[in-house]
Amino acid sequence: MNNQDDRIIIFDTTLRDGEQSPGATLNGDEKLAIARALARLGVDVIEAGFPRASRGDFDAVQRIAAEVGTENGPTICGLARATKGDIEAAGNALKPAFSNRIHTFIATSDIHLEYKLRKSRKDVLAIAPEMVAYAKTFTNDVEFSPEDAGRSDPEFLYQILEAVIDAGATTVNIPDTVGYTTPAEFGALIKGIKENVPNIDRAIISVHGHNDLGLAVANFLEAVKNGARQLECTINGIGERAGNAALEELVMALHVRRQYYNPFLGRPADSEAPLTSINTKEIYKTSRLVSNLTGLSVQANKAIVGLNAFAHESGIHQDGVLKNKLTYEIMDAQSIGLTDNQIILGKHSGRNAFRTRLAELGFDLSDNDLNKAFLRFKDLADKKKEITDWDLEAIVKDETQQPPELFRLELVQVSCGDHAQPTATITIRTPGGKELTDAAIGTGPVDAIYKAINRVVQVPNELIEYSVQSVTAGIDAIGEVTIRLRHEGRIYSGHAANTDIVVASARAYISALNRLYAALQEDVSANPAKASL
């Protein structure tokens, strides 16, 4: 990792803090797919998880360290509370990476000290440097975070930062854990650290923030102006509660407005050199991948990657854009990887054309996954005259980006109408290989299907969200269904796509149940509460 003071280090925590979004549970293969996409995107550091949280988290971090943390790849980071057990777990999980980092933390705000840790300032001032020094026995790259720094006493914050830097911390991260600060306050906090921590020049100042007041990105940009050189963010801004600072928004703000930010990094104002290492043309593909795998849809008006981000409905705006895009667009859609080159495939398109177009869209499938997706494509081509890139994305997502198929839907039939009681019959293959058939009635066809499935699966759950949207226009469009289930306080998402939304609804429900069932099978004996910064 390049630690030059004239550029911004991008630290991605999609796989750690982002996965703490309700319903965003990922399996090992999905985490690896996202990590590979983040490496292609060009992030400097990937926080791959919290190794002590569970055996599954440990294995995922270790696998990412081995397969993505190569000599030319990003630094792989693991989170650890300021305890020897956590730090040892992180150190062991990160061993395979060429470049690794342990990120350890402890709370410093008075409210956290009193009610969560039940420790004094003196206790924490002793623990933090001791644990940083212990982390240094595993790696030379150690990051320390004073949790809830935004509400901590500045003088105590200066003390603890000086102590951990003396103990060997190479990065000190300042989290606005509850999204409480405003840009002016957060900028002043970073400025105060720069001016009052005597050894601050020996460490990189990082920032981490939550979006509870919608100010995370603005806070980060103000922090950059005051000396922050690492930004901790997530794809699509996913994360606990209202989420984290969005990587794509930060990167494009620094890209589009670099002439404004250049002087704050000691550069000539007119320098065209990028302020980050991000390959912006990978942004859109990475956004879609994360959305697909987590089941967290991107709102249409989301900055940079939303469906409407480059759409113009006003006649005046449309006229201006047609004459010159700069009239109403401050950035080129192609700069984030969007393209107007929509190649239409049909039933006469062959396997090679299919593979080629998927590669152009950023999908690198194994032969087995390609075979499954191609068969699905040919089936769809018999129903639709033209298949667009959006259709292809839905096919790949539905066929290859699913949890382990513990329960498999073999058959679904429904009977309904305005003068009939909705009835559903389903056949499911269980994890033990048995085929079980059952039926149920409901308030509608989807309700009947879900009741019939529950009679077979018998895993208690609560359906808390059901949504369906058209992938493309037209009466023959693919319908994409996303659902969320709650079980014992945890949320599991599922998705599926089909030209028949009843079938898609059934498959989405099975997808979510498979995630839930897989989670129940995991050994959670060593699963501490999920950490939060």
From Swiss-Prot:
It is found in: Cytoplasm. Residues 8-269 form the Pyruvate carboxyltransferase domain. Pfam families: HCS_D2 (PF22617), HMGL-like (PF00682), LeuA_dimer (PF08502). The keyword Manganese applies. Signal peptide: none annotated. GO terms for molecular function: 2-isopropylmalate synthase activity; acetyl-CoA C-acetyltransferase activity; manganese ion binding. It comes from the Bacteria. SMART domains: LeuA_dimer (SM00917). Its EC number is 2.3.3.13. Mn(2+) binds at D17, H208, H210, N244. Disulfide bonds: none annotated. InterPro entries: 2-IPM_HCS-like, 2-isopropylmalate_synth_dimer, AIPM/Hcit_synth_CS, Aldolase_TIM, LeuA/HCS_post-cat, LeuA_allosteric_dom_sf, LeuA_bact_synth, PYR_CT. One of its GO terms (biological process) is L-leucine biosynthetic process. It catalyses: 3-methyl-2-oxobutanoate + acetyl-CoA + H2O = (2S)-2-isopropylmalate + CoA + H(+). Pathway: Amino-acid biosynthesis; L-leucine biosynthesis; L-leucine from 3-methyl-2-oxobutanoate: step 1/4. It is an enzyme of class 2 (transferase). Belongs to the alpha-IPM synthase/homocitrate synthase family. LeuA type 1 subfamily. Homodimer. Catalyzes the condensation of the acetyl group of acetyl-CoA with 3-methyl-2-oxobutanoate (2-ketoisovalerate) to form 3-carboxy-3-hydroxy-4-methylpentanoate (2-isopropylmalate). This is 2-isopropylmalate synthase.
